[in-house]
Swiss-Prot record:
Binding-site list for GTP: 59-62
Disulfide bond sites: none
Function of the protein: Displays ATPase and GTPase activities.
One Pfam entry name: PapZ_C
Record keywords: ATP-binding, GTP-binding, Nucleotide-binding
Stated name of the protein: Nucleotide-binding protein CTC_02495
GO molecular function, a single term: GTP binding
Statement: the UniProt record of this protein carries the keyword Ligase: no
Source organism (scientific name): Clostridium tetani (strain Massachusetts / E88)
Family from the record: Belongs to the RapZ-like family.
Residues noted as binding ATP in the record, renumbered to the chain: 8-15
Length: 294
């Protein structure tokens, strides 16, 4: 089991660090009182490996509870529970700038003076910093820089950034666009199988409709261009730390054209090794209804 205790100066990036650890598959707990660490560690170690990556944030917000940190750490060490301490810090100048940008008060500031709070916190955390397994100074870090450093230290072996999950959603404009879509494409310019009597009652999941939609040159050209766009965007989205990409394909009713195109794009992405899901949101809707959906 890997048991990571995240602590450090307020404003140094503990929230971003715990989010990054969560993306790496860690079970995360924020602001756990140090007095509860022994029981928490014991419970985790009793899961027989079901939980094998733990991260928890301990910081000065715990008030007087924070003074019990070393007592708790000594106890779990005596129980042969292994742990690591990640300490985050930054320069005074950067911390002041971050607090002013967020318009938040430092938890230890006296009379509203941020620098006073930073100085007091540095003093109180010195002993913790001295025994930290890893110290990261985030003064010159972007969120992405910190994420990459966390991945380097706490990822599994050669683990890289978590893979982007792509969800291809087909939908009908008459029921409203998917509110969570990142990229949205309108395929109502394609020939509509709805007006072919023998195809009307089928959907884009059925071969007759799928073949009909994809037989047109404009369909083939569109799929090719859309595939090119996605192959260009996906690496850049991944590099910027995006974890989910919703690609919405819409036609009038969400049963024929959008389903066919979504299925085609899904297959192309899957064949290229992308982590991809598909959701035909409106495929079972009665096309005579006009209710809006999310």
């Amino acid at each position: 089991m890997r048991f990571v205790i995240v602590t450090g100066l307020s404003g140094a990036g503990k929230t971003q660090a715990i989010r990054s650890l969560e993306d790496l598959g860690y079970f995360c707990v924020d602001n756990l009182p140090p007095t509860l660490i022994p029981k928490f560690a014991e419970a985790c170690y009793k899961t027989d490996g079901r939980i094998n990556k733990i991260a928890l944030v301990i910081d000065i917000r715990g008030g007087e509870f924070f003074d019990n940190l070393f007592e708790s750490l000594n106890y779990i060490k005596d129980q042969n529970y292994k742990y690591e301490i990640l300490f985050l810090e930054a320069s005074d100048e950067v911390l002041v700038k971050r607090f002013k940008e967020t318009r938040r008060n430092h938890p230890l500031s006296s009379g509203g003076r941020i620098l006073n709070g930073i100085a007091l916190e540095r003093s109180r955390l010195k002993e913790v910093k001295d025994v930290a397994s890893n110290i990261i100074n985030t003064s010159k870090f972007t969120n992405m820089d910190l994420r990459q450093e966390i991945t380097r230290i706490y990822g599994d072996g050669d683990q890289v950034e978590a893979q982007l999950t792509i969800t291809v959603v087909s939908f009908g404009f008459k029921y409203g666009i998917p509110l969570d879509s990142d990229l949205l494409f309108d395929v109502r310019f394609l020939p509509n199988p709805y007006y072919i009597p023998e195809l009307r009652n089928f959907s884009g999941n059925d071969k007759p409709v799928y073949d009909y939609v994809l037989e047109f040159n404009q369909t083939k050209e569109f799929i090719g261009k859309l595939n090119d766009i996605l192959e260009f965007l996906i690496p850049h989205y991944t590099e910027e730390g995006k974890r989910q990409l919703i690609v919405a394909i819409g036609c009038t009713g969400g049963r024929h054209r959008s389903v066919s195109i979504a299925n085609s794009i899904y297959k192309l992405l899957e064949e290229k090794g992308h982590k991809v899901n598909i959701d035909h949101r409106d495929i079972h809707e009665d096309n005579n209804k006009g209710g809006k959906k999310l």
